Amino acid sequence: MSHEELTALAPVGPAAFLYFSRLNAETQEILATLSLCDRSSSVVIAPLLAGLTVEADFGVSVRTPVLCYDGGVLTKVTSFCPFALYFHHTQGIVAFTEDHGDVHRLCEDARQKYALEAYMPEADRVPTDLAALCAAVGCQASETTVHVVVGNGLKEFLFAGQLIPCVEEATTVRLHGGEAVRVPLYPPTLFNSLQLDAEADEVSLDARSAFVEARGLYVPAVSETLFYYVYTSWCQSLRFSEPRVLIEAALRQFVHDSQQSVKLAPHKRYLGYMSQRLSSLEKDHLMLSDAVVCELAFSFASVFFDSAYQPAESMLFSEWPLVTNATDHRDLIRALTELKLHLSTHVAALVFSANSVLYQHRLVYLQSSARHPSAGGTASQETLLKAIQFTNGLSAACEDVYNDARKVLKFQGAPLKDERYGPQHLALVCGTCPQLVSGFVWYLNRVSVYNTGLSGSSTLTNHLVGCAAGLCEACGGTCCHTCYQTAFVRVRTRLPVVPKQPKKEPCVITVQSRFLNDVDILGSFGRRYNVDAKDGGLDGKGDDGVPGGGAGGGGGRDVSGGPSDGLGGGRGGGGGGDSGGMMGRGGRMLGASVDRTYRLNRILDYCRKMRLIDPVTGEDTFSAHGKSDFVAVFSALNKFVDDEALGFVSEVRLKSSRDEVAGATQAFNLDLNPYAVAFQPLLAYAYFRSVFYVIQNVALITATSYIVDNPLTTNLVSKWMTQHFQSIHGAFSTTSSRKGFLFTKQIKSSKNSDHDRLLDFRLYAQGTYAVVPMEIKLSRLSVPTLIMVRVKNRPIYRAGKGNAGSVFFRRDHVPRRNPAKGCLGFLLYRHHERLFPECGLPCLQFWQKVCSNALPKNVPIGDMGEFNAFVKFLVAVTADYQEHDLLDVAPDCVLSYVESRFHNKFLCYYGFKDYIGSLHGLTTRLTTQNHAQFPHVLGASPRFSSPAEFALHVKGLKTAGVPAPMAATVARESLVRSVFEHRSLVTVPVSVEKYAGINNSKEIYQFGQIGYFSGNGVERSLNVSSMSGQDYRFMRQRYLLATRLADVLIKRSRRENVLFDADLIKNRVMLALDAENLDCDPEVMAVYEILSVREEIPASDDVLFFVDGCEALAASLMDKFAALQEQGVEDFSLENLRRVLDADAQRLTDAAGGEVHDLSALFAPSGVGAASGVGGGGLLLGESVAGNSICFGVPGETGGGCFLVNAGEDEAGGVGGSSGGGGGSGLLPAKRSRL
């Protein structure tokens, strides 16, 4: 995307459209399922989905005409809001909506309590006659549903009722299998600028010409929805209390490009200051910071949203695998509902986490984090950056405020004494938008109930029984099974605690992840990148070719040693330039000094060849044929992994350093494309909150730099802002996106003018429609676009100077005897029946009895000698793994086992002794639940006289076959990178850390550091209260919640590397031929691989393809196929094929009695280095290798890793060593990948 042309991404066209369509019941139900609806409102907030709410080829970015001049029009770039508003004839959609009680009254009460501004329709203006508008486009109003989509730049005009529909340009488009009429909407500035009266050119919510008054689209219900869903929410993010002022400012900002002027500061109120004990200087610093970041975020929201974006893959509704795979409409609704249930985990995190982005909008001055100012009364920028933080703002929602003149204004609301989290808090953070509150309540009715044990489930049961009296505050007894009061009773144990004191915490955000990542155990260390890759990488260009820093984020220093918020890295750790790479100008990583991925790929190749994992999916394919086979396979695997770890230690000692290993950084990217979450309006709402949080956090750096040098000397904060804001704006625009956290890019146009045929707006204002050629100018030749934010984690804890290691990372060796609880426990569970047929005991109990020497004699265990060897092997492997285990995470598949073993051995061999931090992805799953905990399955408001009657009714539901309700839970992914490879929606806590550059530079950098969820009700897998007092894994492990979107909403991209069935067979055949399994003829294994997926004998051309063109080998295989045909063999199992084709070899082996020819002398190395053992190459077979602090010999590897004093002869680590240090004649040489 680095070579995109602005004119191609954003064609000339209207930035708002009306759609007139006739919706059938199926489409209405789909819209009700995906949209935000409430019974009290006729407006439905629907997702912006191509093929459902807009046409399939809908362009999300346009250059829209805004102003006229003689002979042409001036266009501005804008992108469409990621939602659509249905507002006429929506009864059919709302009818499918669940009733949640009187949500409208709840929102009104919240406005009164928190003194929020309410929407007031224009008293002297008549709403647009929608029936006449429908008739003008040939539609019948009683059968036509109307909805609008609008660009970010024009949404204020839509709110003001000033957009002009041009019915003469109506066109027919297709929406979800039906036809719709699309009518463009134009801004009033195109017509106002032609009026003779100069005052008519004034852009305002109230000033309108007679033409706009008569023709403008004014729907009060739409304006009200925008007022609460968009603007009240934005005001909360910006700590601004007057939405109408913000709307007016946004209106003029888009038309007049007034981003560099002060717009909000004169009207701003400073909330949350009264509960802080601040000196006058601290208060001045906090007020100025508050005003600056608010103004910058408001200005740059216009800059970033009025830009050019590409449609996200997840907004193509007609191509969703979920849609294309549905068999009928009911199956589609079931799949869409299950998708929403998956999303309930993310919604729960946003509601139940006290550090959610919904609440993190208060700016505070943390005195404990600040250093005392110098005697001169000044403070440094670093001091302010540590002191001024964003925190939970619920506790300060009812405080007195300061105005622009720093005078105290009394709070005008009606605060309650009980400040426990309740429905009004939810209404507050939803901007008192009924549709949004109702959307949250739907999810709260379907998340799991966490009982405390004190009252169990009796609280919910008693509430439902009490509903029979009809005294419910939410619904009056009409819908108590689904109302918001019942929802809050269900989740009362999971609700967040309103904090009494502010504190610095990470912020929980929900966005879509990007594909590229560095999240394996050691992240960026030892990873080499393809700088010329099309999509870039985490090295220099970043995801999608973003310039400006590698995974280290632009270079810098580790500013202190101690843990930050209990994280694995030092405070500021992870933000500096990454170790393990050579940093170029601007922090760009050019390449790692060592290649860890080479070693890992060798291990993975070995696993493929040994048939331990699937060559394509990576899933386990190992099948234990017996205890001896199990021991042989994993003894060889462990030896190979350990040898690779030793070899890598030698390579690192030659080419790298311990500091580089300790500086390893894990990193992943979060997508800021607004259309990545356009499939759900609730997520779109959270997206805007997240973007404002990101911009304001980054803006703090610019704000503090000017505040330190320019103290407040006037009575008005806005006056100081007027004096300095233009410089502040310029500084932020040039530095905000090149400091390691926020990534943007400039999309440029090669020309500033063009010619096309457009509507003659002068004639249209006079009542005549005409299309004429005219010049089209572009107001800006380049626009900045949001790309992503990068989040990091330092896995290896680095203690500060003079500090002992943290107790959270100290490793205490506790022997673990039971193999079922050890590193290979997942295989013992999986193959228990095969290893011990007819055992009669489950796996865990069996091994408990074995380890306790209490296994009954009547339990069949097979040959005693074989069993003893098997148990000794497992005990030894378990003890060895635990001795070197620095991850403290039990493997659950072969891939995670070999990766963990390799890194554990490498780190221990290299001298690391403490636990390291780790990243974990928790992906959502659906499980069945108890009917009694999900009252929505009752179908009607409860009318029970006692708990016993309710229990009997629930039992009747089960007897009647009512399906058990489903709820989302999570499971840990074996490999966290799969979260990003499956394009997941993720909820992750992020803290934005700031630190100074190297060499006493005044540059301040920032990085996103993964943090923690605050509260016990977020997700039970995150809770730590059930752990023992000495278990500190929760301080070392960082989690993100994920829902996979690949193959659900995103069609998996195949690109050019499609693997057909023949390719898969060829891969398996070549792996079988490469395998060094002495127990079976490799050709017989190849025959088995071919016949395992075919029912007939293959043709010779096919066999020639499977063996990569080797004619002699193909002829040999064809002889075996001919033998099978002659004998009429139909059983193609491996055992039968060996019996038929490998019988002679088996007889020879049995007759030899295990004796073999001694041919070792033929393979002994020769030459000068053979006798001396230089590079580990002169060892005889079976000879032991001595290892010490400076020499690690690797048996069977030439050049595999001795640390040589004079290594100049071969930089790879030994005479004759390979370039990777991996050896040329090792145990299993690396071969060219055939995948």
UniProtKB/Swiss-Prot annotation:
It is found in: Host nucleus. Residues 536-584, 1214-1235 are annotated as: Disordered. GO terms for molecular function: single-stranded DNA binding. Signal peptide: none annotated. InterPro entries: DBP_sf (IPR035989), Viral_ssDBP_head (IPR043031), Viral_ssDNA-bd (IPR000635). A motif (Required for filament formation) lies at residues 846-847. Residues 545-584, 1214-1226 have a biased composition (Gly residues). Keywords: DNA replication, DNA-binding, Host nucleus. Its main location: host cell. Residues 1232-1235 are annotated as: Required for nuclear localization. Pfam families: Viral_DNA_bp. One of its GO terms (biological process) is DNA replication. It comes from the Viruses. GO terms for cellular component: host cell nucleus. Belongs to the herpesviridae major DNA-binding protein family. Homooligomers. Forms double-helical filaments necessary for the formation of replication compartments within the host nucleus. Interacts with the origin-binding protein. Interacts with the helicase primase complex; this interaction stimulates primer synthesis activity of the helicase-primase complex. Interacts with the DNA polymerase. Interacts with the alkaline exonuclease; this interaction increases its nuclease processivity. Plays several crucial roles in viral infection. Participates in the opening of the viral DNA origin to initiate replication by interacting with the origin-binding protein. May disrupt loops, hairpins and other secondary structures present on ssDNA to reduce and eliminate pausing of viral DNA polymerase at specific sites during elongation. Promotes viral DNA recombination by performing strand-transfer, characterized by the ability to transfer a DNA strand from a linear duplex to a complementary single-stranded DNA circle. Can also catalyze the renaturation of complementary single strands. This is Major DNA-binding protein.
